[in-house]
């Protein structure tokens, strides 16, 4: 059975070894038995539930299957089913028997039991997928009404409905791609149903669905194996020619050399340059060499034209490649060579890599392939099996399409006529596709299945035709009634009349029977004695027949349901002269539709009168029916004498006209004429027909024009048909109409200006337009003469019909045929041309059939081309122009020569009289045609001359100085300019440092202009370079020289006199090492037993080191101690040592950006196996500019955040020093127990929490609720007048019902988005500029704090302890020192930090309790509080607090204003800086914290580290702050990917450094976008003031002119710059006399320069008080501290005094009311007193405990102020 399994049993099987179904507890005891079961039954997909309890399951070997009650009949055994012919046909055996539906049901029943019980014998060879294919196959082959009996049909239908609901809304491209890669037959069927359903309703969904469905139905998802055959055959023929037919190489080599031209080719290649011009020159030379220039240009033009049509399909290639490897699983194979050979053979034949089920079959065939002979035999067996797999996939796909299309044949699915018509067209396309496959010799074994599929589609087509006919108007038949006495010969006359009307046998209807299944639908229908029964309503039946509305006949058989009456002629007989009484209600309708013929036989009547009672002799009847008298009544004559009264009153009042006598022949003619008249209709043609041409002339010239057009048709062998008048006759091409001016015509019109008989002679000169005197384009003329409708294949040939050949091609190879056919085709049709060429050569006796199929799929160009092919199988003539005609014969037909060019325009020019009648489109077409003709004549020469010019300009070498001027000292370039040694050095250094190529003259002129003070760009840059160079002018040293002349004291220069180059113009990608190594404190040397250096290792922490395997191989030592606990994963390894380095480096799985020496890294970071001197190593290829040496292995490659992502393990050596091999970091569990608490556990699975990807925690810390802000007792009634209110309190707050958790989640989502920031090289350059700028006032090597408690006391103790300890820091302190719980946490973190190990970077999340604008409260916007771990904060304070203090100490003059007191004279220094600027921009940013790029923050942290002492504490703090922060709330931990937490240590300084870096990057990019190279320090040319996201930029005119580009670059980095007042609009320069910075307006007042606090911030101090935590903020607090409240309001009055008397009086009244209602014990100051107190504090005369000493301290309860 296994050798005869069909495609449904072979395709998509999934191997699951039997041993996998056995429980692990029994594995050791039954190994031998399971091995036997594995070898004997390898294709089992699933084991039954009882298999685990038996060595050999009895259920799986039983041949009989008991009925489980699901079937209504007895089921034969599986053995009997396998012997049936239906099962044999399913297995593709060669038999001619038809499939039996009953056998199909039996097979399907067994399949259902096999799927349900899983102990069926079929399970030994079939998996679930194969059984499902069998059931779908049964569905496709059975009629739709019989499918309900198939088991699992309902389940499959439900599954398809679910797939339909899932995919119905998907776009067309998604469905087409999915149907190409899906391996689920149910899913494929559902997708096909969606595509076909939307194609049927394309009016609603778009025409592209119908077009795509038609195209996709003609495509098959298979690999065309025949394409390999001609290629392999050509190789064999070539090999035979070289070795057997022509073994003498002397005869072949000269031809080969002459063809290849190796010398010329070698010279071309030697002169090739890898540049654009070099490639153009080389390719042009090669095309010239092989004479393919013209055709190559044409091909390139065609490719460019079709590029945008093809680019949309490019993704299909990736999908196809990916589908080959989807689901592939490794197998435990023994004979690897034969498995590889079998897999390759399977791919070449089927186009698919074998999946696991097929791989099992391959293993069965190759089980004994242990020798070469047995392997070859097994491969031959496999080839036969593989050959069927390609066809099986085709039949599977056709089955799915058939099921999908047949399910659409449902009135509930396709309801309207348009959808039925499209369904009919799609069914015909699929039917034709299946029919084509039945003609394929390879598919012959599957013909029974294909015929059943065609039968199903025939049913769909028939049903659609019936549904169309029911809904459409039909032709009205003609009904004649032959009335007369019995025996006169009416019935015989009716039969004879039927033969004269049609060649078909007439249909017969008997109205005495109520079912009409015998009606055949032929053209003539006879109803004998139609009025013989009174029980039949024959009047209405006749009215229904003779009608334009469709008539559905009542049929009993199911297959005849919906049958329509379709006959053209109805002949009825009756013995009654009046079949319907005139008084009947239906008499008028009846007689209007019928014509009555009164039939009499005079011979019979006379015989009966003469001899009554005797039979009528045969002599009374004649064969020509001349014995009958046929009298045709007039219209609506109900009897011979009278006509129906129109009013229906007196039917005997109107006499009938005399009858018309006819014979049988004239009666037939009369009936035919009546049918034509009844169904005559006139339909107007809309629009302008594309293939209709009208030639307008006068009436007397019509005949002459007609003769001229016929002459043109004969001269050109044209395909058009000449018609006189607008009516069209049949034509294979266009139609040419001769018209008069008054005739209407829908087509292109041309006015004939010259028409005479003499014009016929002009046709000999091919001047068609001159002879006709019309002005038409050459394209229209070619289209008229040679256009062909559709594709026509002619098996018979008439020489007078053959066109004149333009090309004659003798086909000696496939390439000759393909090269010639390309002229006829568009670019899309060239692939079909090559395929057809293969078929013509391989099977020449089937040329017509194959060419018909090919031509139906091919699109031809609009150019007229005729080619005669002389092939081994005969002659093929192909003519194309829009469509194509082809003649294919098995004998020779010689028809060479003829027209070699298209018809030309003759002597008519656009300046003639016909030009005004020519439309503009034709005039421009004529122009473009002329330009194209000119280009075609010069295109080759133009390309060659262009390439020649490039080649000539390539070799223009500059003369090199010789002799005394070799070093270019002296005369240069023949200008007579001589330089001194110093001038020469200066000129060389200037060109080298600024990357210029100035001549001596230009250099001297530039130096002269710079000395004179010129202000142009070049002079300014030269002066900058000169000033930098002169800084080293005094770099001398006093030395004592002892020589022949004695002892001399001289000064010698210790350094070369050159400008100091800071490298500002060197980009990140251009930098080269070696430089300082990263993580210097964490890198150690690995040595051998003798102490010789082998490589490096990197400390990961806790005595664990990372290195590469070949470094630590053998006896390896670290710091004199042997390493231990070595573990490897590929080339990456880890080990332990008791020697611990002072610092540790963080590791991360990612792509590196820097090598160990600081140079940039270019890599794809895709691990592959590489062969090295140490063996094969799995690593990643990278390129850097640093040259490495032996012993560098193990050094770290880092990313932007300083994390180690790989280790150096090899290089390309001296030949390719830039090539590096890097081993990526992989996690190795060293089983170290964590010594510190950490919430975020990477080993836990990710979960989704309200849209955030996070880790679940063991404990839940909820977000604090309520607020401490309350309305003042003085404003319980009017608090709504204040612009601010306490922030939203959560879900119970009526102002905004948004929960606190939702607010936190919405605030965290921007932090989870990636923010790239500025480019790498730009950020790196600006970072160097900022470091140099800060170096002027920040000292180097600032020592870090070595005492943990000293660092702790530098922190603000009113803040949170972080996620590991609840409460604030001061809550865990006693007598000014931390308690045991806090001290233990600090000690654990400090111990790790002293080893340089990064700490967990985790924060607890809360919401800030503050006043917010009312509109933001209603939106639920609150600012988050990131509670930093107290241990991390202590370590960072120890590391960077000294650097931070040094930066903030210069806030008055530096770019960072952190630490400034805006109520001190410092504000005057800011005002002077602002006033000195040319343009001032005040900028604020929206959502600053969440839009920070991690790379920019890492660069700012590196700046702090640059000025530190680089101790392990600094390394730990730096690595901690660079790692991604983790936000902890509500029992989850979220690792964010961007942003800067507001609670990060030193957040104000880091934010301000970020601000400076962003602005510097934006300016740098804007300048260089204007082609201005930046070689100076930007921060020395403009001033900037930053405090976090607040900024004031003082730009010079140069920078202000590109401010739009600067702010545009800032936006491109992910920032959101806005105006300070948050108004909408571009950021523009502001008035320097009133600048807003830190919510202060810096302006001049009568008291001097002051920073005025925002008025709303002052006023809202009186409306709200801080008290106990509560949800009722509208009620005043229970307890008010009069001291702190009085101090708050006192300070508010002082700030109000700076705004003038009017505003102060308003505040004074509020203060008085507050004192009254709040029962305070202080007197508000007067205006003069407040002014005096504030000025005293400002100038430092009077000091107060609540004075704002720095912006980081609180005053005036600034948690209420929005500062």
From Swiss-Prot:
Site positions (Cleavage): 46-47, 331-332, 685-686, 960-961, 1071-1072
Ordered alphabetically, the record's keywords are: ATP-binding, Covalent protein-RNA linkage, Eukaryotic host gene expression shutoff by virus, Eukaryotic host translation shutoff by virus, Host endoplasmic reticulum, Host gene expression shutoff by virus, Host membrane, Host-virus interaction, Hydrolase, Membrane, Nucleotide-binding, Nucleotidyltransferase, Phosphoprotein, Protease, RNA-directed RNA polymerase, Thiol protease, Transferase, Viral RNA replication
Q: Which residues bind ATP?
A: 484-491
Q: Name one GO biological process term.
A: DNA-templated transcription
What's a GO cellular component annotated to this UniProt protein?
A: membrane
Question: Where's the Peptidase C24 domain?
Answer: 1073-1229
Enumerate the active-site residues: 1110, 1131, 1193
- Outline the extent of the SF3 helicase domain: 458-614
Residues modified as Phosphoserine are: 1067
Recall the GO molecular function terms of this protein's record.
Answer: ATP binding; ATP hydrolysis activity; cysteine-type endopeptidase activity; RNA binding; RNA helicase activity; RNA-directed RNA polymerase activity
User: What InterPro entries does UniProt report for this protein, alphabetically?
Assistant: AAA+_ATPase, DNA/RNA_pol_sf, Helic/Pol/Pept_Calicivir-typ, Helicase_SF3_ssDNA/RNA_vir, Helicase_SF3_ssRNA_vir, P-loop_NTPase, Peptidase_C24, Peptidase_S1_PA
Q: Where is this region: Acidic?
A: 981-986
> At the top level of its lineage, which domain of life is listed?
Viruses
At which residues is O-(5'-phospho-RNA)-tyrosine found? 984
Q: Which SMART domains match?
A: AAA (SM00382)
User: What EC number(s) does this enzyme carry?
Assistant: 3.6.1.15, 2.7.7.48, 3.4.22.66
CDD domains referenced in this protein's UniProt entry, alphabetically: AAA, Caliciviridae_RdRp
At which residues is Phosphothreonine found? 1040
Q: Does the keyword Kinase apply?
A: no
Q: What is this protein called in UniProt? A: Genome polyprotein
């Amino acid at each position: 059975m296994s050798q005869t399994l069909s495609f449904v049993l072979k395709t998509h099987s999934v191997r699951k070894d039997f041993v996998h179904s056995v429980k692990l507890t029994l594995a050791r005891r039954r190994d031998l038995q399971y091995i036997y079961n594995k070898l004997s039954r390898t294709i089992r997909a699933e084991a039954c539930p009882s298999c685990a309890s038996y060595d050999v399951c009895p259920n799986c070997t039983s041949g009989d299957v008991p009925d489980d009650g699901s079937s209504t009949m007895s089921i034969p055994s599986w053995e009997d089913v396998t012997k049936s012919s239906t099962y044999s046909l399913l297995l593709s055996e060669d038999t001619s028997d038809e499939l039996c539906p009953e056998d199909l049901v039996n097979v399907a029943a067994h399949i259902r039991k096999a799927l349900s019980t899983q102990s069926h014998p079929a399970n030994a060879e079939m998996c679930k997928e194969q059984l499902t294919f069998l059931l779908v196959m049964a569905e496709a082959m059975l009629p739709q009404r019989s499918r309900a009996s198939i088991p699992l049909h309902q389940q499959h239908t439900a599954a398809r409905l679910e797939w339909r609901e899932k995919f119905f809304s998907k776009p067309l491209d998604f469905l087409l791609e999915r149907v190409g890669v899906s391996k689920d037959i149910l899913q494929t069927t559902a997708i096909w149903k969606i595509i076909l359903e939307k194609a049927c309703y394309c009016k609603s969904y778009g025409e592209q669905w119908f077009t795509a469905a038609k195209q996709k139905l003609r495509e098959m998802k298979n690999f065309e194996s025949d394409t390999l055959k001609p290629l392999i055959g050509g190789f064999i023929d070539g090999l035979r020619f070289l070795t057997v037919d022509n073994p003498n190489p002397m005869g072949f080599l000269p031809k080969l050399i002459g063809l290849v031209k190796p010398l010329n080719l070698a010279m071309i290649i030697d002169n090739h340059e890898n540049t654009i011009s070099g490639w153009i020159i080389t390719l042009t030379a090669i095309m010239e060499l092989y004479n393919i220039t013209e055709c190559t240009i044409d091909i390139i033009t065609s490719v460019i034209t079709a590029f945008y049509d093809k680019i949309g399909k490019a993704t299909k290639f990736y999908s196809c490649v990916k589908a080959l490897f989807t689901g592939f699983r490794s197998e435990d194979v023994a004979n690897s060579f034969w498995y590889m050979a079998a897999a390759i053979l399977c791919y070449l034949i089927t186009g698919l890599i074998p999946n696991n089920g097929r791989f099992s079959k391959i293993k069965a065939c190759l089980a004994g392939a242990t020798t070469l002979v047995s392997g070859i035999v097994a491969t031959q067996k496999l080839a036969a099996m593989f050959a069927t797999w390609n066809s099986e996939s085709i039949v599977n796909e056709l089955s799915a399409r058939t099921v999908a299309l047949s399910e659409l044949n449902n009135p509930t699915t396709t309801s309207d006529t348009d959808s039925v018509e499209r369904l009919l067209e799609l069914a015909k396309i699929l039917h034709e596709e299946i029919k084509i496959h039945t003609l394929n010799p390879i598919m012959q074994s599957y013909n029974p299945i294909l015929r059943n599929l065609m039968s199903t589609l025939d049913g769909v087509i028939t049903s659609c035709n019936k549904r169309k006919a029911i809904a459409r108007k039909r032709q009205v038949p003609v009904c004649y009634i032959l009335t007369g006495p019995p025996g006169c010969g009416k019935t015989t006359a009716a039969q004879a009349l039927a033969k004269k009307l049609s060649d078909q046998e007439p249909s017969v209807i008997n109205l005495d029977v109520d079912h009409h299944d015998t009606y055949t639908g032929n053209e003539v229908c006879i109803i004998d004695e139609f009025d013989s029964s009174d029980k039949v309503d024959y009047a209405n039946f006749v009215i229904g027949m003779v009608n334009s509305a469709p008539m559905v006949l009542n049929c009993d058989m199911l297959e005849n349901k919906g049958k329509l009456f379709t006959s053209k002629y109805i002949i009825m007989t009756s013995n009654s002269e009046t079949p319907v009484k005139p008084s009947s209600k239906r008499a008028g309708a009846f007689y209007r539709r019928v014509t009555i013929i009164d039939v009499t036989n005079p011979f019979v009547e006379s015989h009966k009168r003469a001899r009554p009672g005797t039979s009528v002799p045969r002599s009374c009847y004649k064969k020509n029916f001349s014995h009958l008298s046929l009298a045709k009544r007039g219209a609506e004559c109900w009897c011979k004498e009278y006509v129906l009264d129109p009013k229906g009153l007196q039917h005997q009042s109107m006499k009938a006209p005399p009858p018309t006598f006819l014979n049988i022949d004239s009666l037939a003619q009369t009936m035919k004429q009546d049918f034509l008249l009844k169904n005559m209709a006139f339909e107007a043609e809309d629009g302008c027909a594309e293939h209709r041409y009208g030639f307008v002339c006068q009436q007397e010239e019509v005949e002459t024009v007609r003769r001229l057009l016929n002459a043109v048709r004969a001269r050109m062998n044209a395909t058009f048909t000449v018609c006189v008048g607008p009516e069209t006759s049949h034509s294979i091409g266009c139609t040419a109409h001769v018209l008069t001016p008054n005739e209407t015509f829908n087509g292109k019109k041309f006015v004939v200006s010259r028409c005479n008989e003499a014009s016929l002679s002009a046709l000999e000169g091919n001047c068609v337009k001159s002879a006709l005197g019309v002005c038409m384009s050459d394209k229209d003329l070619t289209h008229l003469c040679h256009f062909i409708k559709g594709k026509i294949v002619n098996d018979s040939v008439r020489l007078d019909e053959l066109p004149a050949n333009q090309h004659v091609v003798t086909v000696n190879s496939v390439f000759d045929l393909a090269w010639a056919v390309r002229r006829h085709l568009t670019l899309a049709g060239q692939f079909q041309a090559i395929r057809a060429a293969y078929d013509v050569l391989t099977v020449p006796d089937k040329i017509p059939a194959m060419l018909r199929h090919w031509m139906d799929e091919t699109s031809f160009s609009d150019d007229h081309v005729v080619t005669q092919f002389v092939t081994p199988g005969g002659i093929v003539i192909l003519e194309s122009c829009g469509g194509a005609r082809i003649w294919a014969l098995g004998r020779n037909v010689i028809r060479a020569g003829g027209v070699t060019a298209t018809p030309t325009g003759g002597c008519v020019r656009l300046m003639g009289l016909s030009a005004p009648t020519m439309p503009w489109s034709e005039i421009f077409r004529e122009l473009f045609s002329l330009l194209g003709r000119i280009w075609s004549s010069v295109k080759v020469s133009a390309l060659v001359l262009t390439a020649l010019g490039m080649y000539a300009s390539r070799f223009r070498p500059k003369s090199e100085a010789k002799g005394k001027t070799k070093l270019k000292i002296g005369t240069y370039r023949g200008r007579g300019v001589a330089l001194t040694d110093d001038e020469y050095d200066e000129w060389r250094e200037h060109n080298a440092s600024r990357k210029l190529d100035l001549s001596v003259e230009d250099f001297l002129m530039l130096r002269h202009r710079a000395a004179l003070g010129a202000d142009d760009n070049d002079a300014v840059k030269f002066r900058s370079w000169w000033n930098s160079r002169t800084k080293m002018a005094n770099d001398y040293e006093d030395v004592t020289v002892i020589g022949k002349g004695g002892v001399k004291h001289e000064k010698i220069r210790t350094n070369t006199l050159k400008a100091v180059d800071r490298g500002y113009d060197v980009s990140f990608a251009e930098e080269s090492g070696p430089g300082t190594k990263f993580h210097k404190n964490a890198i150690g040397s690995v040595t051998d037993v003798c102490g010789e250096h082998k490589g490096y290792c990197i400390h990961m922490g806790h005595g664990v080191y990372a290195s590469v395997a070949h470094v630590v191989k053998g006896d390896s030592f670290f710091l004199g101690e042997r390493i231990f606990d070595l573990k490897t994963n590929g080339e990456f390894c880890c080990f332990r040592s008791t020697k611990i380095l002072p610092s540790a480096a963080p590791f991360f799985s990612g792509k590196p950006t820097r090598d160990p020496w600081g140079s940039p890294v270019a890599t794809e970071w895709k691990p592959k196996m590489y062969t090295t001197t140490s063996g094969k190593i799995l690593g990643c290829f990278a390129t850097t500019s640093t040259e490495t040496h032996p012993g560098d292995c193990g050094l770290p490659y880092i990313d932007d955040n300083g994390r180690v992502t790989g280790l150096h393990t090899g290089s390309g050596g001296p030949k390719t020093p830039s090539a590096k091999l890097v081993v990526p970091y992989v996690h190795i569990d060293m089983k170290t127990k964590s010594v510190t608490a950490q919430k975020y556990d990477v080993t836990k699975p990710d979960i989704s929490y309200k849209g955030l990807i996070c880790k679940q925690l063991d404990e839940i810390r909820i977000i604090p609720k309520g607020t401490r802000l309350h309305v003042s007792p003085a404003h319980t009634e009017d608090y709504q007048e204040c612009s601010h209110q306490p922030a939203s309190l959560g879900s119970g707050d009526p102002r905004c019902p948004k929960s606190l958790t939702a607010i936190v989640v919405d605030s965290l989502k921007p932090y989870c988005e990636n923010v790239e920031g500025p480019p790498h090289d730009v950020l790196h350059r600006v970072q160097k500029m900022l470091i140099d700028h800060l170096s002027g006032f920040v000292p180097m090597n600032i020592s870090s704090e070595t005492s943990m408690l000293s660092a702790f006391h530098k922190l603000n103790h009113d803040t949170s302890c972080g996620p590991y300890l609840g409460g604030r820091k001061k809550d865990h302190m006693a007598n000014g020192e931390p308690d045991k719980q806090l001290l233990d946490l600090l000690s654990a973190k400090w111990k790790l930090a002293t080893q340089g190990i990064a700490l967990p970077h985790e924060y607890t999340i809360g919401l800030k309790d503050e006043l917010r604008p009312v509109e933001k409260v209603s939106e639920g916007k609150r600012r988050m509080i990131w509670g930093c771990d107290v241990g991390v904060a202590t370590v960072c304070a120890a590391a960077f607090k000294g650097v931070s203090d040094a930066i903030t100490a210069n806030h008055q003059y530096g770019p960072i204003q952190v630490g400034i007191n805006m109520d001190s004279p410092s504000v005057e220094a800011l005002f002077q800086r602002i006033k000195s600027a040319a343009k001032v921009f005040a900028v604020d940013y929206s959502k600053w914290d969440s839009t920070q790029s991690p790379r920019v923050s890492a660069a700012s942290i590196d700046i702090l580290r640059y000025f530190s002492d680089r101790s392990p504490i600094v390394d730990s703090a730096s690595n901690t702050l660079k790692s991604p922060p983790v936000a902890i709330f509500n029992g989850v931990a979220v690792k964010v990917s961007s942003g800067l937490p507001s609670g990060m240590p030193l957040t104000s300084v880091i934010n301000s450094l970020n601000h400076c870096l962003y602005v510097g990057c934006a300016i740098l990019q804007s300048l260089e976008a204007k082609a201005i190279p930046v070689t100076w320090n930007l921060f020395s040319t403009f001033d900037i003031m930053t405090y976090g996201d607040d900024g004031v930029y003082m730009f010079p005119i140069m920078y202000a002119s590109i401010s739009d580009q600067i702010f545009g670059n800032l936006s491109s980095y992910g920032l959101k710059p806005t105006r300070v007042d948050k108004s909408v609009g571009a950021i523009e320069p502001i008035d320097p006399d009133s600048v807003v910075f830190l919510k202060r307006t810096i302006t001049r007042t009568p008291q001097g320069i002051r920073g005025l606090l925002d008025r709303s911030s002052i006023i809202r101090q009186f409306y709200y008080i801080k008290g106990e935590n509560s949800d009722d903020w509208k009620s005043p607090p229970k307890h008010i501290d009069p001291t702190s409240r009085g101090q708050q309001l006192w300070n508010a009055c002082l700030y109000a005094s700076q705004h003038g008397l009017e505003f102060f009086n308003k505040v004074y009244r509020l203060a008085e009311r507050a004192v009254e209602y709040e029962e305070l014990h202080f007197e508000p100051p007067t205006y003069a007193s407040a002014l005096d107190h504030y000025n005293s504090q400002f100038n430092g005369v009077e000091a107060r405990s609540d004075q704002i000493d720095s912006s980081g301290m609180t005053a005036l309860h600034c948690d209420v102020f929005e500062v």
